[in-house]
Regions:
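N-terminal catalytic scaffold of extracellular/periplasmic and nuclease hydrolases
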Residues: 13-166, 172-196, 200-201, 302-365
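Active-site proximal loops enriched in glycine and acidic residues that flank catalytic Cys/His/Asp
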Residues: 208, 252-256, 261-263, 273, ...
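Active-site His/acidic residue clusters
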Residues: 125-130, 209-216, 231-232, 243-279
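Gly-rich Lys/Arg/Thr-decorated short loops/hinges at beta-loop-alpha junctions or inter-strand turns
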Residues: 80-88, 204-216, 258-264, 335-337
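Bacterial N-terminal signal peptides
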Residues: 1-5
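Active-site regions of oxyanion-processing enzymes, predominantly non-cytosolic
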Residues: 191-205, 227-255
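Metal-dependent active-site segment of extracytoplasmic phospho-/sulfohydrolases and closely related
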Residues: 31, 274-315
Length: 365
C-alpha cells in the first residue's frame, strides 16, 4: 500500500549520471506538511493529482547547523549548497565567515547553465545561500550585489526593491543589463510569453518588489509550475562557455511553506505545499521527457512542529495543529527521480546531499 501511495511502484529510475540537476526545496516542509497536502489532494476536496508520488527514491535528511540543534534557513541552505555546516544566520560562508563555493557556482565553472526560481525575495536566505556569501542573512542589499555578479543565467522571484531602491543609489538591474547583457523583465506574464532568448543572453525577472503574494491573496496557482517549465526550457541548452551540451543546475524554492508554519496557519501551509507539488509536476514532466535530468526534493528544515490531529480531509476542517512558531529539529524528507536518484535513498546529513550531487557530476566536493 505504501509503495502505491508514494510511487515506489513506478517505472524504474535512478541509475546512471544526470546531465541536468533540478534541486527543489520546500522551506519548512516536513513529513506532516507533505502528509496533509497528500490527504487533501487525493482523499479530500483536491483534484486527485499527486505529483510527489511520482518520485521513485526516498530518504531522510538531518538538518542541524554547526552551532545549534535547530537550524535556520541560512545555515540549512548553506549545508545543501556547499556541503558544509555553518552557524545560524550565515549564507554561503563557513563557521569562520569565509566564502564557500556552492554547487551552483561549481556548475557554472564547469560550463553548465544555472538558474534560481523562488516565491520569496531572491535575497532571502535560501537563494542567497546558493549564489551569495555574507556573514548575516539580513544584509539584503549586499546579497543583491552578490547576486548581480553571480554566475547565473536565469533568476526569477521577488525582491526587486533590494536591487533598485538602495542606500547606495545604484540600480543593479540596469548594471546587469549594461555590464553583463541580462535581459531584464518585471512581469511574469511577459517572461512566459517571450520568445526564447539567445543562448548567450541571461535573464533576470524580479516580478515582485517584495515576496510573491500568497495563493490566498491572488497568486495564480499555476504560475510557479509554468515558470518551472519555462526555466527548464530556457536552461536546456549549452552554456556560453561550454564546448558541448553540458547541462544545467536549477534551484527552485517553495519559500512560503515556512511562513505558514511560523504563523501556525494550516491553510497557508497547505496551499503553499500544494503549489510546490505542482512545481514538482512540471519538473518531473521535463525530466521524464528529457531522460537525463535528476530531480531532488527536500527541505532546509521543518517549521511549526505541525501535526494532523483530527477533522476531515479538506483544507477547511483538517485538524492541523502546531507545537511552536519556530523551526524544529525534525528530520525532513528527501525524494528523487531520474539518473542518480538512487544516491538519495538514505538517512543522511543535509551536507551529504551536496556531496552525492557533486559525485554524480564528478565535481570535487
Amino acid at each position: 500500500m505504501t509503495a502505491l501511495l508514494w510511487g515506489w511502484g513506478a517505472e524504474a529510475q535512478g541509475t546512471g549520471k544526470p546531465r541536468n540537476i533540478i534541486m527543489i526545496i520546500g522551506d519548512g516542509m516536513g513529513h506532516t506538511q507533505v502528509s496533509a497536502a497528500y490527504l487533501h489532494q487525493t482523499q479530500g476536496s483536491g483534484d486527485g493529482s499527486w505529483n510527489m508520488g511520482r518520485f521513485t527514491h526516498f530518504g531522510y535528511s538531518v538538518t542541524t547547523s554547526s552551532d545549534a540543534l535547530i537550524t535556520d534557513s541560512g545555515a540549512g541552505a548553506t549545508a545543501l549548497s556547499t556541503g558544509r555546516k555553518t552557524y545560524n544566520g550565515a549564507v554561503g560562508v563557513g563557521p569562520d565567515s569565509l566564502p564557500l563555493q556552492t554547487i551552483l557556482e561549481k556548475a557554472a565553472a564547469t560550463g553548465r547553465r544555472t538558474g534560481m526560481l523562488v516565491t520569496c525575495e531572491v535575497t532571502h536566505a535560501t537563494p542567497a545561500s546558493y549564489a551569495a556569501h555574507r556573514i548575516d542573512r539580513d544584509l539584503y542589499e549586499d546579497i543583491a550585489l552578490d547576486l548581480s555578479l553571480a554566475p547565473l543565467d536565469w533568476l526569477v522571484g521577488g525582491g526587486r526593491n533590494h536591487f533598485v531602491t538602495r542606500q547606495d543609489q545604484r540600480n543593479l538591474l540596469e548594471e546587469m543589463h549594461k555590464d553583463r547583457g541580462f535581459k531584464v523583465m518585471d512581469r511574469s506574464e511577459d517572461l512566459l510569453k517571450a520568445p526564447r532568448s539567445s543562448a548567450k543572453q541571461p535573464v533576470v525577472a524580479l516580478v515582485w518588489d517584495g515576496p510573491a503574494p500568497r495563493i490566498s491573496e491572488g497568486r495564480d496557482p499555476g504560475l510557479m509550475a509554468a515558470l518551472t517549465a519555462r526555466a527548464c526550457r530556457d536552461l536546456d541548452r549549452p552554456a556560453p562557455i561550454a564546448t558541448n551540451d553540458s547541462g544545467f543546475f536549477l534551484m527552485i524554492e517553495g519559500s512560503q511553506i515556512d511562513w505558514g508554519g511560523h504563523a501556525n496557519d494550516g491553510d497557508y501551509v497547505l496551499a503553499e505545499t500544494l503549489d510546490l507539488d505542482r512545481v514538482v509536476g512540471a519538473a518531473l514532466d521535463f525530466a521524464r521527457q528529457d531522460g537525463n535530468t535528476l530531480v531532488v526534493l527536500t527541505a532546509d528544515h521543518e517549521t511549526g512542529g505541525m501535526a494532523i490531529n483530527s477533522g476531515a480531509r479538506d483544507a477547511q476542517s483538517m485538524g492541523l495543529a502546531f507545537t511552536t512558531k519556530k523551526h524544529t529539529a525534525a528530520l525532513v524528507p528527501v525524494m528523487a527521480y531520474g539518473p542518480g536518484a538512487e544516491a538519495m535513498s538514505a538517512m543522511m546529513d543535509n551536507t551529504e546531499i551536496y556531496r552525492r550531487l557533486c559525485g554524480l557530476w564528478s565535481l570535487e566536493p
